[in-house]
A protein has these predicted regions:
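C-terminal cap of thioredoxin/glutaredoxin-like
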Residues: 2-26, 105-183
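Structural alpha/beta surface segment adjacent to cysteine/selenocysteine redox centers
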Residues: 8-113
């Protein structure tokens, strides 16, 4: 939920999957963990952006979100945001079949509504929007197996060559990076 490009890429795979009759296996990751481990240059680019590239990326994001029917407020008030609790929530909700509803509500709260998704009251409201019991959610995201699963997902995407978000695998091994790279 912390990646604007991740937000721009969520609706297209669902449409493609529906059209082709295939399933999507969503795997929550900690993009900050990936950046810290294999792609720390992201931080330097944030500190010293290339003005022409930054202007183009803003236009490109606006084009993608408009074509997907999404609204994104740029820049969000809190950026980067600590998305650990939200991503643990995605990991906890994945086996319950509620990951997509929760992730969608989280993306909208952060990118559309400019809310700080690291805050408990915001996550509580997101849970309610997604039909998730907030008390069970906060108990669930504190469980060690949930933390371990999120770390394992993050480690796995790096082991498979991933360096950011969105990273998409087709047929388990064919990797694509970026919302505009889907086959």
């Amino acid at each position: 939920p912390a990646s604007k490009w991740g937000r721009a890429s969520t609706s297209l795979p669902m449409l493609i999957a529906e059209e082709l009759g295939v399933d999507i296996s969503w795997r929550p990751i900690l993009v900050g963990g990936i950046f810290n481990t294999v792609n720390p240059s992201v931080y330097a680019q944030r500190e010293t952006p290339v003005p022409l590239k930054a202007r183009y990326m803003k236009k490109d994001l606006a084009d993608w979100t408009r074509s997907a029917g999404l609204s994104i407020k740029m820049p969000p008030t809190v950026f980067p945001v600590n998305s650990v609790k939200a991503m643990r929530g995605c990991a906890w909700l994945e086996p319950q079949g509620k990951l997509v509803a929760f992730a969608t509500a989280t993306f909208e709260a952060y990118w559309r509504d400019d809310q700080d998704i690291s805050q408990v009251p915001v996550l509580t409201a997101i849970c309610r929007t997604a039909g998730v019991d907030p008390d069970a959610f906060f108990a669930g995201i504190d469980q060690q197996p949930v933390k371990d699963q999120l770390k394992a997902n993050t480690d796995e995407v790096m082991a498979r060559g991933g360096f950011g978000s969105p990273t998409i695998f087709v047929d388990k091994t064919d990797m694509y990076f970026g919302n505009d790279r889907m086959p």
